[in-house]
C-alpha cells in the first residue's frame, strides 16, 4: 500500500516525501537489513567461491592488469604463494547471511522505510583482515547501523543511512568488515539553478592535447610490484605517483558489471527481469518503449537521471572505490597489505569525466597491533578541478627491523547475521 505522501508517475516512477515517519521506519530497522539495499530475482552472489579466473576477470574489468591478481604463475612466487584478490573484489562475493526477522509484521511495516526516494552511494570504510585467495567462500551480512538527517541547500532534506557490512567464511573467520553510507533524497528535477551547485557543470570535451596528457599518464603508470616497500624507506610528506582514470564511458560501466555482477539489485534479462520486478516493483519504471526497465539505468539514461535530480548520466560509486583500490595497490606493491580504506564520493562522476588520482603519505608508525604501518590520504580530481573522491588508507608494510607483514587478528563476526550452515 502506498503511503499518503507517495505518488507514482505515468512511467511508474515512485516519488515520496522524505517524511519523519519514513525516517523512523528506517531507524526501526537498526540491526536488520536495509529494505532499500536488497537483491532482486536471486540472492546468489556473482562469485560464490573465489577462483583465479574470477580474480583475473575482476581486475581486468576495473582496468587493473597487476600480475599479482591476474597471473597465477607470477603470484605463486610472491609471499602469498598464489593468486590473491585486490581490495574491493569482495563486492562480487557474499552468500546471503543477513539477519532473519522474527516478526513478519515488523518486517512488512518497516519495508516501507524511505520508499520512493532516490538513493546515492556516498562512500564507506572497509577493514581487511586477510587476502581473499583461491577457494575462499564468503557469507555476507548487511544491516542498518545509524540514520541521520541532513539539510542542504542543494538537496534540501536528506537521510544518511550508515549500513554495516561483515563478510566471513565457513569457520567464522572475518575477511572484511566496515560500513557503507547512502544518501536518500527526494526525486525531483532541479528547477532553481541558483541553488544547484552542479548547474554550471557542462559535459566533458577534450582537445587532442588533453587526450595526449591522459594517454601519457597511462603510459607512465607506476606499479611497485616485487620491489618491496620498507617502512624504513618511507618518508612522511612523500607524494605518491599520479594515476589517471577515464574519461569515464558506458563501456567502463559494462566492464565493471562484467567483473562484479550487479552488486546489489540484480538487473537480469527477459523472464528473469519480470521475476525481479515482482520482488522489487519500485525499482522498475517504463522506458521510451513503454516497457519496464530497472532504475539502474540512471547511470546510462540521461532522461531518467534528470528525473531523479541529476544533471547527466553518472557512475556507480563502486567505480571510484575500485580506482582507490588500484591506486593504493600499485603503490604498496606485492609485499604490503591494505588494511583499511575509507572513501568518500564528493561529487557526481559524469559520463565523460576524467579522474586524476594523487596521494601523500601523512604518517608512519609502529602500531601495537598492526606493526609497521603508513597512513595515506588521496584524492581524485576531475577535469573541472573538483574533487570527486577523497580517501584515506592504512597500509601494513614490511620492515627490515620487524620483518614481513603479519596479518592482523580479525574480530568476531557481527551478531546481526544468520549462522553459517
Question: Where are the language model's segments positioned?
Answer:
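Residue-level signal for well-ordered, solvent-exposed loop/turn and beta-edge residues enriched
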Residues: 172-174, 238, 386
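Generic structural signal for residues positioned in beta-strands
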Residues: 57, 89-90, 125, 179, ...
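A structural microfeature
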Residues: 175-178, 241, 389
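Hot-dog-fold acyl-thioester-processing enzymes
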Residues: 2-123, 189-335, 400-421
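Residues in well-ordered beta-strands of folded domains
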Residues: 91-92, 127, 181-183, 243, ...
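Flexible glycine-rich active-site/ligand-binding loops centered on an Asp-His dyad
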Residues: 158-168, 174, 178-200, 394-401
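Hydrophobic beta-sheet segments that form the core/acyl-binding groove
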Residues: 122-171, 179, 337-383
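Ligand-binding pocket scaffold of soluble enzyme catalytic domains
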Residues: 181-182, 351, 358-366, 373-378, ...
Amino acid at each position: 500500500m502506498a503511503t499518503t505522501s507517495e505518488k507514482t508517475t505515468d512511467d511508474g516512477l515512485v516519488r515520496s516525501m522524505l517524511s519523519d515517519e519514513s525516517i523512523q521506519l528506517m531507524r526501526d530497522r537498526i540491526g536488520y537489513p536495509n529494505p532499500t539495499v536488497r537483491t532482486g530475482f536471486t540472492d546468489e552472489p556473482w562469485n560464490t567461491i573465489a577462483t583465479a579466473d574470477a580474480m583475473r576477470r575482476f581486475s581486468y574489468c576495473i582496468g587493473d592488469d597487476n600480475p599479482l591478481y591476474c597471473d597465477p604463475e607470477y603470484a605463486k612466487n610472491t609471499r602469498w604463494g598464489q593468486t590473491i584478490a585486490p581490495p574491493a573484489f569482495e563486492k562480487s562475493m557474499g552468500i546471503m547471511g543477513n539477519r532473519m526477522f522474527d516478526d513478519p509484521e515488523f518486517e512488512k511495516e518497516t519495508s516501507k522505510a524511505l520508499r520512493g526516494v532516490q538513493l546515492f552511494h556516498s562512500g564507506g570504510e572497509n577493514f581487511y583482515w586477510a587476502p581473499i585467495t583461491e577457494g575462499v567462500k564468503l557469507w555476507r551480512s548487511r544491516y542498518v547501523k545509524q540514520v541521520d538527517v541532513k539539510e542542504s541547500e542543494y538537496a534540501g532534506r536528506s537521510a544518511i543511512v550508515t549500513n554495516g557490512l561483515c563478510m566471513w567464511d565457513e569457520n567464522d573467520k572475518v575477511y572484511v568488515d566496515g560500513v557503507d553510507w547512502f544518501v536518500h533524497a527526494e526525486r525531483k528535477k532541479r528547477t532553481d539553478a541558483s541553488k544547484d551547485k552542479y548547474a554550471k557543470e557542462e559535459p566533458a570535451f577534450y582537445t587532442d592535447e588533453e587526450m595526449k596528457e591522459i594517454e601519457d599518464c597511462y603510459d607512465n603508470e607506476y606499479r611497485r610490484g616485487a620491489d618491496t616497500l620498507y617502512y624504513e624507506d618511507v618518508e612522511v610528506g612523500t607524494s605518491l605517483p599520479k594515476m589517471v582514470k577515464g574519461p569515464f564511458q558506458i563501456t567502463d560501466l559494462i566492464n565493471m558489471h562484467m567483473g562484479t555482477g550487479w552488486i546489489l539489485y540484480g538487473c537480469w534479462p527477459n523472464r528473469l527481469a519480470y521475476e525481479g520486478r515482482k520482488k522489487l516493483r519500485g525499482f522498475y519504471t517504463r522506458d521510451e518503449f513503454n516497457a519496464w526497465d530497472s532504475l539502474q539505468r540512471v547511470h546510462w539514461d540521461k532522461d531518467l537521471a534528470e528525473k531523479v535530480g541529476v544533471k547527466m548520466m553518472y557512475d556507480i560509486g563502486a567505480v571510484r572505490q575500485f580506482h582507490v583500490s588500484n591506486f593504493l595497490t600499485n603503490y604498496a606493491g606485492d609485499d604490503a597489505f591494505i588494511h583499511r580504506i575509507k572513501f568518500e564520493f564528493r561529487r557526481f562522476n559524469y559520463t565523460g569525466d576524467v579522474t586524476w588520482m594523487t596521494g601523500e603519505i601523512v604518517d608512519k608508525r609502529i602500531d601495537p597491533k598492526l606493526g609497521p604501518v603508513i597512513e595515506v590520504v588521496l584524492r581524485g580530481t576531475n577535469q573541472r578541478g573538483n574533487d570527486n573522491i577523497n580517501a584515506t588508507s592504512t597500509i601494513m608494510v614490511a620492515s627490515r627491523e620487524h620483518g614481513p607483514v603479519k596479518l592482523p587478528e580479525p574480530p568476531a563476526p557481527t551478531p546481526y547475521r544468520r549462522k553459517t550452515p
